[in-house]
C-alpha cells in the first residue's frame, strides 16, 4: 500500500513543526503506600538523602530513608491528595531556602514561602537548609556583648555575640517574653548604628509547634514596635505537618547564616526545640527507625548539636560576622534532667533557668540566679557592667540561702540582717515589666545604686518607685552622663568613674522622698 503525496506533506509538516523540541527527561518513582505524612516510593534509585521530590499537584517531600527496595519520603503538606501509584519526580536539589535582606520584615514557612500576604519574596540567593557548621579555624572566642535589655540577664547571665544561651523553664514562665524583649531591645542599637551594618543585629524568630494566634500576636507586637524591619519570622505552627516543624529551625538558621557570612551580626531564637524533637520522633517512628530513650531516635542529640553548632563568632579573615542563638526548651514539672533538656544544656554555652515558683511570687523575669549560668558571656560584658554587676550574683545567692534559714530563727546578728535587707531590695530591683528593655548605661546606674547602699534606707515596697524616678531623672537631666558611661567604658576597669556615679546618685537621693 503506497503513501499518497498529501500524506507525505502532512508527515513532513508534522516533523518540521516538532523539530528541536526535546523530550523532558526526569527520574520518576511510584508511590507504594502513603499515610501519616510518610510516603514509601519505589523506583528512585539515585535519589540523594535530604533531596526534594515532587508529588502530583506540586506537593513537595524530602527523601529521608534510603532503603534497598524503596525510599521513605516525608511530605511537606497534606498527604490526602497523594495516592498509591502516583508518580514522584526527583528535583536533583537538596532542600534549600531563600536568603538575603529581602526576607526582612516577612513571615515565612519552613520552606521560605510567604505567609503574610505581602506578595512573593524576590530573594537573589538560596541557601541549603542543613549545612555543615563552621570548623575550628574560622571561629573566634566570643568578646562582644549582645544586650537583652533585661537587668537580671545583662548583669548576671550576660550573652555575647556568637554565644548559644539556652532559655529553659516550665510552660508559662516567660521564656518567649525574654526572647521577644531581646528583639525589641535591638531597635535602639540598630537605629544608632545608622548605615553601619557591622554594628546592627538582625533577628530571626522561629516558631515551632506554636498556636497560630500566638505567632500572630508576636508579629503584631514586632510591627507596632518597628522591630519587623530588622527581623524575619519563620513559622511552623501546631497545625503544620511534623516534617515542616522539623525543618523550620534548619531553614531559619540558613537565613540567619546569610548575615553571619556577610560580616554582619544575627540573632536566632528557636521557640522551642522540645517541639522540634517531638516532631522528629514522630517522623522517625513512622519511618520505622529504632526508638531509644523516651522513644526518641538515637540521633536526637545530633539533631540539635548540628543545628546549634552553626551559631558562632567568626574571625576577621572570614568577615568577623556572628550568629547568636537563644534556643528555648520547655521542661515538664521543672525536670531539667529529662533527655532533651540535658542534651541541649550540654550543647549550649549556658542557660537562663526560669522557675514557676518565682513567676507566681511576682519576680518577673523569673530567673533562678543560682541555677542560671553563662559560660562565655562574662568576657563579652562591658567593663562598666562587669565592674558593678560582680557583687550582685553573690549577694542574691547568699540572700536566697540565708532567707531559707532565717525562717527558723529570729535572733539574727547585724551582718545577717544587713545581708537579708539588701538581698530583698536587690530581688525587688531585678523585677522588670515586659516590653520595657533598658540600655546598658541605665542598668549600670540601677545596679550601682543597689550594691552601694543607696536602697538600704528605701522601703522594699518603694524600690520600684525609686527605680522609675531614677530612670526619669537620668533620661531627662543626665542624658549626657548616660552617654559618658558608654564612652568611658574602659575606665571602669580602674574604678575611676565611681566618684562621678556616686555624685549623680547623691544628687538624686536628695530629691527622692
Swiss-Prot record:
The keyword Secreted does not apply. ATP binds at residues 169-176. It is found in: Cell inner membrane. One of its GO terms (cellular component) is plasma membrane. The record marks 372 as: Required for activity. It is a peripheral membrane protein. Keywords: ATP synthesis, ATP-binding, Cell inner membrane, Cell membrane, CF(1), Hydrogen ion transport, Ion transport, Membrane, Nucleotide-binding, Translocase, Transport. Pfam families: ATP-synt_ab (PF00006), ATP-synt_ab_C (PF00306), ATP-synt_ab_N (PF02874). It catalyses: ATP + H2O + 4 H(+)(in) = ADP + phosphate + 5 H(+)(out). The keyword Transport applies. Its EC number is 7.1.2.2. GO terms for molecular function: ADP binding; ATP binding; proton-transporting ATP synthase activity, rotational mechanism. F-type ATPases have 2 components, CF(1) - the catalytic core - and CF(0) - the membrane proton channel. CF(1) has five subunits: alpha(3), beta(3), gamma(1), delta(1), epsilon(1). CF(0) has three main subunits: a(1), b(2) and c(9-12). The alpha and beta chains form an alternating ring which encloses part of the gamma chain. CF(1) is attached to CF(0) by a central stalk formed by the gamma and epsilon chains, while a peripheral stalk is formed by the delta and b chains. Produces ATP from ADP in the presence of a proton gradient across the membrane. The alpha chain is a regulatory subunit. NCBIfam families: atpA, PRK13343.1. Belongs to the ATPase alpha/beta chains family. This is ATP synthase subunit alpha. It comes from Ruegeria sp. (strain TM1040). The gene is atpA.
Amino acid at each position: 500500500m503506497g503513501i499518497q503525496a498529501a500524506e507525505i506533506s502532512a508527515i513532513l509538516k508534522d516533523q518540521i513543526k516538532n523539530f528541536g523540541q526535546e523530550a523532558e527527561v526526569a527520574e520518576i518513582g511510584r508511590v507504594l503506600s502513603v499515610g501519616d505524612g510518610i510516603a514509601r516510593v519505589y523506583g528512585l534509585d539515585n535519589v540523594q538523602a535530604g533531596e526534594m521530590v515532587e508529588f502530583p499537584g506540586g506537593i513537595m517531600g524530602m527523601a529521608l530513608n534510603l532503603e534497598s527496595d524503596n525510599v521513605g519520603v516525608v511530605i511537606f503538606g497534606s498527604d490526602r491528595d497523594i495516592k498509591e501509584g502516583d508518580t514522584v519526580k526527583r528535583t536533583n536539589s537538596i532542600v534549600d531556602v531563600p536568603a538575603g535582606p529581602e526576607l526582612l520584615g516577612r513571615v515565612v514557612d519552613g520552606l521560605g514561602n510567604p505567609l503574610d500576604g505581602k506578595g512573593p519574596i524576590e530573594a537573589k540567593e538560596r541557601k541549603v537548609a542543613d549545612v555543615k557548621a563552621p570548623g575550628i579555624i574560622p571561629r573566634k572566642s566570643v568578646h562582644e556583648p549582645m544586650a537583652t535589655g533585661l537587668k537580671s540577664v545583662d548583669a548576671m547571665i550576660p550573652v555575647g555575640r556568637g554565644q548559644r544561651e539556652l532559655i529553659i523553664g516550665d510552660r508559662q514562665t516567660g521564656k518567649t517574653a525574654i526572647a521577644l524583649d531581646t528583639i525589641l531591645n535591638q531597635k535602639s542599637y540598630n537605629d544608632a548604628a545608622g548605615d553601619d551594618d557591622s554594628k546592627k543585629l538582625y533577628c530571626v524568630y522561629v516558631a515551632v509547634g506554636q498556636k497560630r494566634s500566638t505567632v500572630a500576636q508576636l508579629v503584631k507586637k514586632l510591627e507596632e514596635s518597628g522591630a519587623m524591619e530588622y527581623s524575619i519570622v519563620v513559622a511552623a505552627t501546631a497545625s503544620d505537618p511534623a516534617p515542616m516543624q522539623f525543618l523550620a529551625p534548619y531553614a531559619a538558621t540558613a537565613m540567619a547564616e546569610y548575615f553571619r557570612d556577610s560580616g554582619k551580626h544575627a540573632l536566632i531564637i528557636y521557640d522551642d526545640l522540645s517541639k522540634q524533637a517531638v516532631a522528629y520522633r514522630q517522623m522517625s517512628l513512622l519511618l520505622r527507625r529504632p526508638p531509644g530513650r523516651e522513644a526518641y531516635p538515637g540521633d536526637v542529640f545530633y539533631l540539635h548539636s548540628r543545628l546549634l553548632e552553626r551559631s558562632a563568632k567568626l574571625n576577621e579573615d572570614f568577615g568577623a560576622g556572628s550568629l547568636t542563638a537563644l534556643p528555648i526548651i520547655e521542661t515538664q514539672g521543672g525536670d531539667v534532667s529529662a533527655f532533651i533538656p540535658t542534651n541541649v544544656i550540654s550543647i549550649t554555652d549556658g542557660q537562663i533557668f526560669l522557675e514557676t515558683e518565682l513567676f507566681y511570687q511576682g519576680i518577673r523575669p523569673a530567673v533562678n540566679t543560682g541555677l542560671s549560668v553563662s559560660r562565655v558571656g562574662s568576657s563579652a560584658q562591658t567593663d562598666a557592667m562587669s565592674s558593678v554587676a560582680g557583687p550582685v550574683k553573690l549577694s542574691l545567692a547568699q540572700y536566697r540561702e540565708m532567707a531559707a534559714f532565717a525562717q527558723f530563727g529570729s535572733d539574727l546578728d547585724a551582718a545577717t540582717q544587713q545581708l537579708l535587707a539588701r538581698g530583698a531590695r536587690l530581688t525587688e530591683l531585678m523585677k522588670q515589666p515586659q516590653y520595657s528593655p533598658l540600655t546598658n548605661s541605665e542598668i549600670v546606674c540601677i545596679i550601682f545604686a543597689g550594691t552601694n547602699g543607696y536602697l538600704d534606707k528605701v522601703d522594699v515596697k518603694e524600690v520600684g518607685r525609686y527605680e522609675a524616678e531614677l530612670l526619669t531623672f537620668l533620661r531627662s537631666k543626665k542624658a549626657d552622663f548616660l552617654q559618658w558611661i558608654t564612652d568611658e567604658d574602659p575606665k571602669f576597669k580602674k574604678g575611676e568613674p565611681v566618684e562621678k556615679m556616686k555624685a549623680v546618685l547623691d544628687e538624686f537621693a536628695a530629691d527622692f522622698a
